[in-house]
Design a protein with these regions (language model features):
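Sec/Tat signal peptide C-region and signal peptidase I cleavage site
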Residues: 16-20
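N-terminal low-complexity, Ser/Thr- and acidic-residue-enriched intrinsically disordered segments
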Residues: 21-88
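A conserved cap/lid and substrate-binding interface adjacent to the catalytic center
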Residues: 61-181
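A short secondary-structure junction signal
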Residues: 107, 190-191
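Sec-dependent N-terminal signal peptides
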Residues: 4-13
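Gly/Ala-rich beta-loop-alpha elbow adjacent to hydrolase catalytic centers
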Residues: 182-186, 190
Length: 191
């Protein structure tokens, strides 16, 4: 009886371990796919209409739209790509921010002083950013904060700090996944 019980326990243990390993490989493949597509998107965002990376992504079902906005401080360039995950049925959205490409961007990079950070609306974030960063509150790179504020104003939230565009879709669609990525200044914005 002990041998049968031991055999059943071993079968359960090894069967569960094999199933867990299979799931782990699937997750690893999915992570590798996300990483490869994110890297391709980081390259493609520099020449969105002509890039071979975006052509490759489009050939695999990705819909990609480039965006550019400019205000007095920042020129914001990014793309929004969307696709449906074949094996999980989840809606995937990827926002890719372009990196440093001009003097204005370098000006943003070189604003290295800290600024206070926090809040849940644009107004709160702007008010907190005007505080002294030495108040023992979270602080971020001033230039990156300026860039992210520009992105938020131009494409993420409306005047009432409600999500709009793709961010609204992600917020309202429970079975969706948002990937934020970028290179250089774009990587800072994505973070």
């Amino acid at each position: 009886m002990k041998k049968i019980l031991l055999a059943l326990l071993c079968l359960c243990f090894y069967g569960t371990a094999a199933f867990a390993a299979e799931k782990s490989i699937k997750e690893q493949l999915r992570d590798s796919y996300y990483t490869a597509i994110s890297a391709a998107s980081c390259l493609g965002v520099y020449l969105p209409e002509r890039s071979s990376e975006f052509s490759f992504m489009r050939s695999h079902g990705w819909e990609i739209a480039p965006y550019a906005f400019e205000d007095e401080d920042v020129r914001t360039n990014f793309s929004i790509a969307s696709n449906t995950c074949v094996d999980c049925g989840m809606e995937l959205y990827m926002v890719t921010f372009k990196g440093t490409t001009n003097k204005k961007d370098w000006g943003i990079n070189l604003k290295t002083s800290h600024t206070a950070y926090g809040g849940t609306t644009l107004e709160e974030m702007e008010a907190i950013a005007k505080r002294d960063p030495q108040e023992k509150k979270p602080a971020v790179h001033e230039g990156f904060n300026t860039y992210v504020d520009s992105v938020l104003r131009s494409s993420v939230v409306d005047a009432q700090s409600k999500f709009k565009g793709v961010f609204k879709k992600v917020y309202e669609t429970p079975n969706s996944h948002l990937i934020l990525t970028g290179h250089s200044l774009g990587g800072a914005a994505a973070t």
